[in-house]
């Protein structure tokens, strides 16, 4: 005699929860095995080995009765096979164990005569139907694993060879594999004993499903999801008889109905209402989900199942008709639903954002809306990826391509964010609701129960006490709520009250069941909001539809009207974590890497697109800024002049000339210009980038704004260098003033980006522009400073040294003295103070310092050459130094000097470089005085008032970096010192002899016809006047390095030597030697003027100033006579 079953002892509720979770875990593992076996790269290596090919064929053919004696090929590798296939094999063993547990539980539920009704015992019915569908899906996916027989047979053969006996579970496992070759046939046989239970569950779905599977027009008529449709009840809490049923997934119900009725297809002829929902489900889709991206072409599958059943031709005809309807109408119906939901969710989001307090009474609306939207997205994904097998001729799949999908995704994310943000508002509301209304109502209904068994009474009391004990203070104190025991107790109660012989039947206390169902929803909102959000709006399915996810993102990126919603795609990557299962930890790493990789790619592409739009706008603004430059007005002035002169040949082209500002004239605002469209696209894309400060995926936080900052920074740096337009071959470069105008226009556009996105654009400017003052940027690329450094030192100054370009003291620029065309560029356009100020603005003190160091390096090289010339003439120079008061000896010894012209040439080159450096420093001082006047004045004070020694050296370096003139140039001194031998006692003598060499060589300049002094440019035609700067700077630095503190004495000695040499020139009778004598006299005057150590009184004592005054008169007159004025 069979023992009686006590329902209270069967723990049906607990078993349903555990088996559903375990079934999902095993389904995950079987799914991964199927994917691995279907991919040649990831399948177990043994299945592809040529040496095992015959053995595997033998195993598959004889499966499951395999004779291992004929499998000699696997004897030596049996241990490796067991190790490699162990996980696969034990997954199938777990499936067999799961199958046994499911069958046992279903049998127990049948024996207890449980009645299922989703409107009353929601959890019990839902978990039962979920378990059935998971079980069916498992068996169908199992039948799709390609190498299942090979894997199991190979493992078992290796196991038997190693242990001399087969695995104990293999016979049953092998039989299960054979039984489920055609899974639905076997499953239908298994479920014959469970038809009563399955029938009650499916029949209860008829009313719920009919209200859910409606076209968009019906939703509009019902004002579904509308908060403003009936303002009178706006503040009232939403209450329905089937609270939990409101947000069941329609996709889940489709699977319950289709798979349930495939197992119990006799119902189709017995219950018309069931047949109606069956056909409705079949007409709304042509594929049904099994798991993730595994789907079933359901109509063909049903036809194949019904084909062998007598009298089912009518059913097969209905299925075919449903398939045709689905192919023709389903896509349009679902498209209209998505269209409705876009508007409905947007309205919900706007109202809830404005009045978050409504999240309390109207929370269910949020979850219903999310659930409906998620169902439509899942439908679109699966059907887009699996188009109908038999397409109608000429019918396109345009309804399966939704360009507005990002908007729907965005509104879902917006609502999810609102729920999380105002979770405490919802908690506060429902804690009061539970304690103030639900607990009171439950107490009243408990008192009205005429008969209540002890177990049920204890649970009811516990439920009441839990709800009644809640207070608002718990919310204010951020106390963690935990209502899982509450919900589990209600689940147990459903089981006790649904058995056939229950003393307290749930069907007779429907109102009590509905109250507890609504209380379950309220507790979930209080303690389990995240789980509700996952249940209603999880989109982790995108992880398995990689291509469509990527395609939708790029489609959105290319469609400006949807740009603002593109942030939804990175946000969805945070959902991917939800699809992992603890029973399959090995896939966790892959899903994690996938989600991190995708969110990074998406944010990078969004930032790049925004950067490209900004760059296009910047280019246009730079073009317009360039059009405002003075050089472009010549054409307009020329045409206007021609008009006045009535020159028709020129004036007819006036209309073709586009004036700056013409782009601002419009006939109508409706005609969008390219710039309008770009600004609109930028606004939309920046809205998306600015939508959330961080996107949290797994344990990482991604900042969209930082992606934009980095892209802008990189592009700005690259474009800054590009705008220099430096051509290595032709050595052409942009004028600094024009570059500065373009940079300012570019920066003005970037500044406006702050109006759209909360980014620190000043930080971008500082990073980029500061890098441009260095020789290389952070990417190792050349900078503006480096390019201009190269051009000025290698192009401009070399051209000056070659002749035809003169440094003009009064114009403060290098000017050409040859006819136009002899020099490939106008040096004045690059070297006047305005241009150098622009250069100083661009490269700053750091860039100028780098340029200065380069120039000093060139000077140091020239000085080294001069020292070698001194060494060659050492003895002669020593004699000249000691005999400056003996004219005859000086004359004779001077004739013995070698390379006099080379000395003068190198000193001139040094002078040109120093003059240019002084110009650059003057421009820098002007810029700093404008930018940092107080700091610059402090630097000047330090320079002027600090005592000598190390302190003055530091102050001089600081002053030099700021562009201020110093008695001795610290950079030049440092550079020369680096070239000097560490222990060289003759360095001072060399400096003295070099000074003598230059002093006695100066008169020879008078022989040169290009040494003529041009008053109009205040300089000599061959830049001889630049020697004044060279003499003062070079000798000052050299004597400072020697450290003998005799600079002033040595410069007096130089003046004595130079003046006596020039005075002897006055006694020279050779006209060739005195050709430009007056011009050279002026050089002596310039040396004294520029020297910090010499004075005019000292000059007067050595050289009559009347000669200099007469020289000035003479060169002015001579220039007028020759007509050399520029």
Swiss-Prot record:
Bilayer-crossing regions: 989-1006
Keyword Membrane: yes
Keyword field: Cell membrane, Membrane, Transmembrane, Transmembrane helix
Entries under InterPro entries matching the protein: Nck-associated_protein-1
Pfam families: Nckap1
Membrane topology: Single-pass membrane protein
This protein's record includes keyword DNA damage: no
Localisation per UniProt entry: Cell membrane
Annotated PANTHER family: MEMBRANE-ASSOCIATED PROTEIN HEM, NCK-ASSOCIATED PROTEIN 1
Subunit: Component of the WAVE complex composed of Hem/Kette, Scar/Wave and Cyfip where it binds directly to the C-terminus of Cyfip.
Function: Plays a role during growth of the oocyte.
Entry protein name: Membrane-associated protein Hem
Organism for this UniProt entry: Drosophila melanogaster
């Amino acid at each position: 005699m069979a023992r009686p079953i006590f329902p209270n002892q069967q723990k049906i509720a607990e078993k349903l929860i555990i088996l559903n979770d375990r079934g999902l875990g095993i389904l995950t593992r079987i799914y991964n095995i199927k994917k691995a076996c279907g991919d040649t790269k990831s399948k177990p290596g043994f299945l592809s080995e040529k040496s095992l090919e015959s053995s595997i064929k033998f195993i598959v053919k004889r499966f499951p009765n395999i004779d291992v004696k004929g499998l000699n090929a696997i004897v030596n590798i049996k241990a490796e096979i067991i190790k490699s296939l162990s996980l696969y094999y034990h997954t199938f063993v777990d499936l067999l164990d799961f199958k046994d547990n499911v069958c046992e539980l279903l049998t127990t539920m049948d024996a207890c005569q449980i009645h299922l009704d989703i409107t009353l015992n929601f959890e019990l019915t839902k978990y039962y139907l979920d378990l059935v569908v998971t079980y069916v899906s498992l068996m169908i996916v199992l039948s799709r694993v390609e190498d299942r027989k090979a894997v199991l047979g190979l493992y078992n053969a290796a196991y038997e060879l190693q242990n001399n006996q087969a695995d104990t579970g293999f016979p049953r496992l092998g039989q299960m594999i054979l039984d489920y070759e055609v899974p639905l046939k076997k499953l239908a046989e298994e479920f014959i004993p469970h038809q009563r239970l399955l029938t009650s569950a499916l029949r209860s779905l008829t009313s719920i499903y009919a209200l859910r599977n409606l076209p968009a027009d019906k939703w509009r008529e019902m004002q579904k999801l509308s908060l403003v449709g009936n303002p009178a009840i706006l503040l009232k809490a939403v209450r329905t008889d089937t609270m939990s049923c409101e947000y069941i997934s329609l996709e889940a119900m489709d699977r319950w109905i289709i798979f349930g009725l495939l197992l119990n297809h006799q119902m189709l002829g017995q219950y018309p209402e069931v047949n109606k929902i069956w056909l409705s489900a079949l007409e709304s889709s042509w594929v049904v989900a099994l798991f993730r991206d595994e789907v079933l072409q359901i109509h063909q599958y049903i036809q194949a199942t019904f084909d062998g059943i007598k009298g089912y031709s009518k059913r097969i005809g209905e299925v075919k008709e449903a398939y045709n309807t689905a192919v023709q109408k389903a896509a349009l119906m679902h498209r209209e639903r998505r269209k409705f939901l876009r508007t409905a969710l947007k309205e919900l989001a706007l109202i809830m954002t404005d009045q978050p307090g409504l999240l309390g009474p109207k929370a269910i609306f949020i979850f219903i809306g999310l659930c409906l939207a998620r169902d439509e997205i899942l439908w679109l994904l699966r059907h887009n990826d699996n188009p109908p097998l038999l397409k109608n001729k000429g019918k396109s799949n345009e309804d399966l391509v939704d360009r507005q999908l990002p908007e729907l995704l965005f509104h879902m994310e917006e609502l999810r964010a609102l729920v999380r943000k105002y979770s405490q508002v919802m908690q506060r509301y429902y804690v009061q609701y539970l304690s103030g209304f639900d607990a009171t109502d439950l107490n009243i209904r408990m008192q009205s129960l005429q008969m209540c068994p002890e177990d049920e009474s204890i649970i009811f009391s516990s439920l009441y006490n839990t709800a009644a004990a809640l207070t608002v203070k718990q919310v204010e104190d951020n106390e963690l709520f935990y209502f899982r025991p509450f919900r589990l107790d209600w689940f147990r109660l459903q089981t006790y009250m649904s058995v056939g012989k229950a003393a307290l039947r749930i069907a007779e206390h429907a109102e009590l069941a509905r109250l507890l169902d609504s209380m379950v929803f309220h507790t979930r909102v209080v303690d389990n909001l995240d789980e509700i959000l996952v249940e209603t709006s999880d989109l982790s399915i995108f992880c398995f539809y990689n291509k469509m996810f990527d395609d939708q993102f790029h489609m959105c990126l290319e469609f400006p009207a949807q740009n603002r919603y593109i942030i939804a795609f990175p946000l969805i990557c945070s959902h991917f974590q939800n699809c992992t299962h603890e029973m399959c930890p090995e896939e966790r790493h892959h899903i994690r890497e996938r989600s991190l990789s995708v969110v990074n790619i998406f944010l990078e592409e969004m930032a790049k697109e925004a950067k490209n739009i900004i760059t296009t706008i910047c280019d246009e603004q730079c073009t317009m800024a360039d059009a405002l430059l003075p050089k472009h007005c010549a054409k307009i002035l020329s045409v206007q002049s021609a008009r006045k002169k009535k020159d028709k040949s020129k004036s007819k082209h006036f209309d073709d000339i586009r004036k700056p500002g013409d782009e601002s004239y419009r006939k109508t605002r409706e005609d969008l210009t390219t710039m309008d469209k770009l600004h609109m696209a930028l606004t939309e894309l920046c809205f998306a980038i600015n939508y959330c400060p961080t996107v949290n995926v797994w344990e990482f936080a991604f900042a969209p704004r930082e992606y934009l900052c980095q892209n802008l920074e990189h592009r700005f740096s690259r474009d800054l260098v590009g705008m220099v337009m430096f051509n290595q071959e032709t050595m052409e470069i942009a004028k600094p003033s024009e570059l500065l105008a373009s940079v300012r226009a570019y920066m003005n556009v970037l500044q406006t980006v702050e109006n759209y996105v909360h980014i620190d654009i000043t930080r971008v400017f500082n990073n980029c522009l500061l890098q441009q003052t260095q020789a290389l940027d952070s990417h190792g690329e050349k900078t503006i400073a480096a390019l201009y450094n190269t051009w000025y030192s290698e192009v401009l100054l070399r051209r000056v040294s070659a002749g035809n370009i003169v440094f003009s003291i009064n114009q403060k620029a290098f000017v050409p003295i040859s006819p136009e065309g002899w020099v490939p560029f106008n040096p004045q356009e690059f070297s006047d103070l305005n241009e150098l100020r622009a250069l100083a603005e661009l490269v700053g003190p750091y860039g100028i310092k780098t340029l200065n160091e380069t120039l000093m390096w060139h000077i140091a090289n020239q000085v080294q050459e001069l020292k070698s010339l001194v060494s060659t003439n050492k003895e002669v120079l020593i004699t000249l130094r000691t005999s400056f008061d003996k004219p005859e000896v000086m004359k004779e010894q001077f004739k013995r000097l070698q390379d006099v012209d080379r000395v003068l040439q190198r000193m001139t080159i040094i002078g040109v470089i120093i003059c240019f450096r002084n110009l650059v420093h003057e421009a820098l001082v002007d810029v700093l005085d404008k930018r940092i006047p107080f700091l610059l004045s402090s630097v000047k004070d330090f320079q002027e008032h600090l005592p000598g020694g190390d302190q003055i050296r530091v102050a001089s370096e600081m002053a030099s970096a700021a562009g201020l003139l110093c008695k001795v140039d610290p950079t030049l001194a440092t550079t020369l010192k680096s070239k000097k031998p560490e222990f060289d006692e003759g360095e001072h003598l060399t400096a003295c002899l070099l000074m003598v060499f230059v002093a006695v060589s100066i008169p020879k300049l008078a022989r040169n016809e290009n040494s003529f002094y041009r008053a109009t440019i205040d300089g000599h035609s061959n830049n001889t006047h630049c020697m004044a700067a060279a003499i003062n700077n070079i000798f000052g630095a050299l004597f400072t390095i020697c450290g003998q503190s005799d600079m002033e004495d040595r410069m007096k000695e130089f003046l004595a030597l130079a003046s006596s040499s020039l005075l002897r020139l006055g006694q020279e009778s050779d006209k060739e030697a005195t050709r430009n004598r007056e011009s050279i006299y002026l050089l002596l005057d310039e040396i004294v003027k520029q020297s910090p150590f010499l004075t005019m009184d000292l000059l007067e004592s050595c050289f009559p100033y009347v000669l200099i005054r007469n020289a000035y008169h003479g060169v002015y007159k001579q220039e007028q006579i020759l007509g050399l004025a520029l």
